[in-house]
Swiss-Prot record:
Reported consequences of knocking out the gene: Changed locomotion behavior with mutants displaying decreased reversal frequencies consistent with decreased glutamergic signaling.
Source species, domain of life: Eukaryota
Assembly mode: Interacts with usp-46; the interaction increases the catalytic activity of usp-46 in the presence of wdr-20.
CDD domains noted in UniProt: Ubl_WDR48, WD40
Single GO MF descriptor: ubiquitin binding
Protein name per its UniProtKB record: WD repeat-containing protein 48 homolog
Family annotation (SMART domains): WD40 (SM00320)
Organism: Caenorhabditis elegans
Region entry Disordered, spans: 341-364
Tissue-wise expression: Expressed in several head neurons and cells in the tail including the anal depressor cell.
Length: 683
């Protein structure tokens, strides 16, 4: 299945990307920032920085098991079963909501889109629609179940409302936020929408009139999470200022502040009675706090990494909590009441006044409750009741000097080598020192960069653009191919494009045999067939995705037709018309080496392709200069032995005959001016 928006081929410049990954990505990689639980069917939906939404069959609490050691891998004997993946996003998944009576999942992503999925149990494909109302990262979603409306908010300052029953038609654009929006909440009947973010204030809207109602101030840093009660009278907010604030919406003011956390609070969950809040964030602590008394915060447990998302498995009398963190593991923790924890007051429990305390709606000033050092408490739980293990994510990468291979180190400390042209991992080094392996694989060669690599998804993503993709010419020998022919020139970018579009009919039609190929056609003949599961993405110059498909699907009728409409013209020119840029010319000067004490050194200015080898320059010097110079005596020798009778230098560094001028200039000359070479006969 593919996702596409039609744009003219003559419009803004486009890029193409592909992801190097396993055929089946069963486990989350890196951070998990979005969770939804379908209690009726026992399904958990997870999403995060690896762009993939996964579905898991998980046991109910009565089937929960002792998690000593946790779950190590999905399998027949595991209580957790991987069910499938939803793969259309091209960047981090930030939020998800279940709607349509549990039949529809909506997801929001940094790829600027909101996507709609059919998640009925008998539907394996899922993708319904792609909503492109936003122009920047879509950070959060909210759901009004009574009226079947969904709400999205973005870094583009906009809040949109969609009618689920009308094919997700956009029915409102709530305008008024002046900065990026990080958090969103709505009442079940959509009578009120709250949005907040980097403005440090909370804005309230009435979607029925599209009007701004009020603005709530109090946070001193970004507001990262919002919750509102069903009747729209109270709201909770959490911020990077490490506070949780309770608001009386009627009075338009903060009536209580909780400062139990040490660092930013990023996620909140509240039970259905709006009496208890569960919070977590950067300090890794998961805390339970009764709303009637913010001094009664209890440390439930502490995670191994900052917490991105909390999700109660049920809102009525909750007994467990799903947790997603900056790590790839997902855990379910029991939050059943354990032994009574005494916090404040005397040892017999809270005082009568505290126990009966409720937040007053009077005109009294906001209350900041006494600080309780939650971090000094012993957590009520030490082991999760369920663990869905994640996979290691690539955390560091380096492009090698050959501009074909990328070395990586993952979150487990393992080092691996990837071949970009083949879109595959080709070697595992285990737990080695990264820099040492880079040095082992580095060569004394300069090749222009023709792609950009990033690993923010936990996997390698390779991006090619019009300016650089076809700039990398090199000899077949330098490219590492078996023929070792320095006369045959290859273009890495052209080869990569042929690999990516190999199955697309217009590309197939231009394939030729080596015997019949001209020099331009030979430049891409050695392309490598890629794994069919490789995702291919066409995007705008700013990275906004236009089309996503699998490399193996490019030959299918629907995908082929879409590619014909969306493929960038520079790609079509390269693979359909064999149009590649010409070799770059490089001017350089030749002078006798100062050690030869030339009487009147003549400075010859020449020009050649930047891939010309030093030994070719030596042949020129031998034939045109040394052989006619009465002051220098050289014997008559075969051209292929000239390097035994003379040497070439740049900045007093002796050059290897197999080096090309491009490498000499970038590794030895290192100046903006024209290259200067010295020659010296060997006696």
């Amino acid at each position: 299945m593919s996702s596409c928006v039609n744009t003219s081929q003559t419009g803004p410049k486009k890029k193409i990307s592909f992801i190097i990954r396993d055929e089946h990505e069963y486990s989350n990689r890196s951070a998990v920032s979005a969770l939804q639980y379908d209690a009726q069917n026992g399904r958990l939906f997870t999403g995060g920085s690896d762009t993939i939404i996964r579905t898991w069959s998980v046991p109910h609490h009565k089937d929960a098991f002792s998690a000593r050691g946790g779950v190590r891998s999905p399998g027949k004997n595991s209580p957790v079963q991987y069910q499938g993946s939803l793969e259309q996003h091209t960047d981090w998944v930030n939020d998800m909501i279940l709607c349509g009576h549990g039949k529809i999942l909506i997801s929001a992503s940094n790829d600027t889109t909101v996507k709609v999925w059919n998640i009925e149990r008998d539907n394996k494909h899922g993708f319904i629609d792609c909503i492109r109302t936003h122009k920047d990262y879509v950070s959060c979603l909210a759901y009004a179940p009574i009226v079947e409306k969904a709400v999205s908010a973005s870094f583009d300052h906009n809040i949109f409302v969609y009618d689920i029953n009308a094919n997700f038609k956009t029915v409102n654009n709530l305008i008024g936020c002046k900065d990026s929006i990080y958090s969103l909440a709505t009442t079940p009947n959509l009578s009120l929408v709250l949005g907040a973010g980097t403005e440090k204030c909370i804005r309230l809207f009435d979607p029925r009139t599209n009007e701004k109602i009020m603005k709530l101030r109090g946070h001193t840093d970004n507001v990262r999470a919002l919750v509102v009660n069903d009747d729209g009278t109270r709201a909770l907010s959490a911020g990077s200022d490490a506070t949780i604030r309770l608001w009386d919406i009627g009075q338009q003011r903060c009536i209580a502040t909780c400062i139990a956390h040490e660092e930013g609070v990023w996620t909140l969950q509240v039970d259905s009675s709006f009496t208890t809040v569960y919070s977590a964030g950067k300090d890794k602590m998961v805390v339970k706090t009764p709303l009637y008394d913010f001094t009664k915060s209890q440390l439930l447990f502490k995670e191994e990494a900052p917490v991105k998302k909390l999700l109660l498995s049920e809102k009525d009398n909750p007994v467990s909590l799903w947790v997603g963190t900056w790590k790839s593991d997902i855990k379910r923790w029991s939050i059943r009441p354990s032994a009574q924890l005494s916090i404040g007051g005397d040892e017999d429990g809270p005082s009568t006044s505290n126990a009966n305390h409720s937040v007053s709606a009077s005109s009294s000033p906001p209350v900041t409750f006494k600080y309780i050092r939650v971090k000094d408490q012993k957590g009520q739980q030490s082991t999760p009741e369920l663990v869905i293990p994640g996979a290691p994510a690539i955390k560091k990468h380096a492009m090698l000097s050959d501009k074909r291979h990328v070395l990586t180190r993952d979150s487990d400390g393992n080092v691996a080598l990837y071949d970009v042209l083949a879109a595959r991992k080709i070697k595992d080094y285990g737990k080695r020192i990264f820099e040492e392996v880079v040095d082992e694989n580095s060569r004394q060669v300069y090749i222009p960069s023709w792609f950009v690599v990033d690993s923010k998804s936990g996997m390698l993503q390779i991006t090619l653009d019009e300016l650089d993709a076809l700039s990398s010419w090199l000899s077949s020998k330098d490219a590492g191919f078996d023929d070792n022919d320095r006369e045959t020139k290859l273009n890495y970018g052209g080869m990569m494009l042929r690999s990516l579009f190999e199955r697309w009919p217009p590309c197939k039609m231009t394939n030729v045999d080596a015997a019949d190929a001209d020099d331009v056609q030979k430049a891409t003949l050695n392309f490598i067939s890629l794994p069919e599961h490789t995702p291919l993405i066409i995007c705008e110059g700013n990275g906004r995705p236009l089309y996503r498909l699998l490399v193996g699907d490019a030959g299918k009728e629907f995908e082929a037709n879409e590619l014909a409409q969306i493929a960038p013209m520079w790609v079509i020119d390269a693979i359909e018309r064999n149009q590649l840029p010409k070799f770059n010319k490089m001017p350089f000067y030749l002078l006798p080496h100062p050690s030869t004490n030339p009487k009147q050194p003549k400075k010859d200015r020449l020009s050649a392709t930047e891939m010309l080898q030093v030994k070719k320059v030596m042949e020129h010097v031998y034939e045109k200069i040394l052989s006619t110079n009465d002051d220098i005596t050289v014997g008559s020798i075969p051209l292929n032995q000239i390097h035994t009778k003379m040497e070439m230098y740049c900045n007093d560094q002796r050059l290897e005959p197999d080096m090309d001028l491009r490498t000499v200039k970038h590794l030895y000359w290192k100046q903006s001016g024209e290259l200067l070479l010295h020659y010296k006969p060997v006696k």
